[in-house]
């Protein structure tokens, strides 16, 4: 009887259990077939069933069924930054969120990609500026070379003359002594203008102080003018009696003294008067030491004409 009651209780517990697992179901007297044979017998069977339930609880408790664990999805490969992503609605919402998060994480390299063209543009601009600076330096060097090679317009550069040319020019020149210190080349040219065409007037100056030395040289267009100008020897010029004699040529390597004045190095102020018949000589020596006058125009240059 006890075994039958325990089996009936187990079957009733399995069939009549509610929503909660392991819920006990008490036997009602007379409900079962075997227990309904009699009231006394049924009550006794019920009591024996309770005792069996209390003595053997392990048989009445049902073990809860284990819930199935969700299967983990394999990791999906990430698409490269430039590859087109899946369209809207093609994937699950979870996948879309993951893609959005990955896009946010991978957005930082995109900013660097945007900065790269700007950096390249800055580098290109710096290279252009360096090239322009190099071109400017080259132009400046070319201008300096041209200025050193050719004299500026308006100034007479030194012309190297041969000994024959110097002697020929000296044969058409005269020496004028006792010249007033305030005299100008234009005044001397006007004083000797009647003797012939004057190519150049040179007033010698001291190379340290720059003051006139008191004598000058006048170059004519031809030798005939030299002979005519000798007639003005001991004539008055600015209230002083001047001395007029033919000019002598300095020969290289020979130290000469002309009328008590050393003729080695000195500064000069020169005025050149060009005519259709005359030939212009910028100087007798190559070293510039003086102020040169071309015609009536006045320019500055340094050279030693005699």
Curated annotation (Swiss-Prot):
PROSITE patterns: RRM (PS50102). Changing residue 136 to A/S: Inactivates PAPOLA. Signal peptide: none annotated. Keywords: Acetylation, Coiled coil, Cytoplasm, Methylation, mRNA processing, Nucleus, Phosphoprotein, RNA-binding. Changing residue 213 to Q: No changes in poly(A) affinity. Residues 155-306 are annotated as: Necessary for homooligomerization. Residues 51-72 have a biased composition (Acidic residues). Residues 286-306 are annotated as: Interaction with PAPOLA. Its main location: nucleus. GO terms for cellular component: cytoplasm; nuclear inclusion body; nuclear speck; nucleus; ribonucleoprotein complex. Involved in the 3'-end formation of mRNA precursors (pre-mRNA) by the addition of a poly(A) tail of 200-250 nt to the upstream cleavage product. Stimulates poly(A) polymerase (PAPOLA) conferring processivity on the poly(A) tail elongation reaction and also controls the poly(A) tail length. Increases the affinity of poly(A) polymerase for RNA. Is also present at various stages of mRNA metabolism including nucleocytoplasmic trafficking and nonsense-mediated decay (NMD) of mRNA. This is Polyadenylate-binding protein 2. It comes from Bos taurus. The gene is PABPN1.
């Amino acid at each position: 009887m006890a075994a039958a009651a325990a089996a009936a209780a187990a079957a009733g517990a399995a069939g009549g259990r509610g929503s909660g697992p392991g819920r006990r179901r008490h036997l009602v007297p007379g409900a079962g077939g075997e227990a309904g044979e009699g009231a006394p017998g049924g009550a006794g069977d019920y009591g024996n069933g309770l005792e069996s339930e209390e003595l053997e609880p392990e048989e009445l408790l049902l073990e809860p069924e284990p819930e199935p664990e969700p299967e983990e999805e394999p990791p999906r490969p990430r698409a490269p930054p430039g590859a087109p992503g899946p369209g809207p609605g093609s994937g699950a919402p979870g996948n879309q969120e993951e893609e959005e998060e990955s896009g946010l994480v991978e957005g930082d390299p995109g900013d660097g990609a945007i900065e790269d063209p700007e950096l390249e543009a800055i580098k290109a601009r710096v290279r252009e500026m360096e090239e322009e600076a190099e071109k400017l330096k080259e132009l400046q060097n070319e201008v300096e070379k041209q200025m050193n090679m050719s004299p500026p317009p308006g100034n007479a550069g030194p012309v190297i003359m041969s000994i024959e040319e110097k002697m020929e020019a000296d044969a058409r020149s005269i020496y004028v002594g006792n010249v007033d210190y305030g005299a100008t080349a234009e005044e001397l040219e006007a004083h000797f203008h009647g003797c012939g065409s004057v190519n150049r007037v040179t007033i010698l100056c001291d190379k340290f102080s720059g003051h006139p030395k008191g004598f000058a040289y006048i170059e004519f267009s031809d030798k005939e003018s030299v002979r005519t100008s000798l007639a003005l020897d001991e004539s008055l010029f600015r209230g002083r009696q001047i001395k007029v004699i033919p000019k002598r040529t300095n020969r290289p390597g020979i130290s000469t003294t002309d009328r008590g004045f050393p003729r080695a190095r000195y500064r000069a102020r020169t005025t050149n008067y060009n005519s259709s018949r005359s030939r212009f000589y910028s100087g007798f020596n190559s070293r510039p030491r003086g102020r040169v006058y071309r015609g009536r125009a006045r320019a500055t240059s340094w050279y030693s004409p005699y």
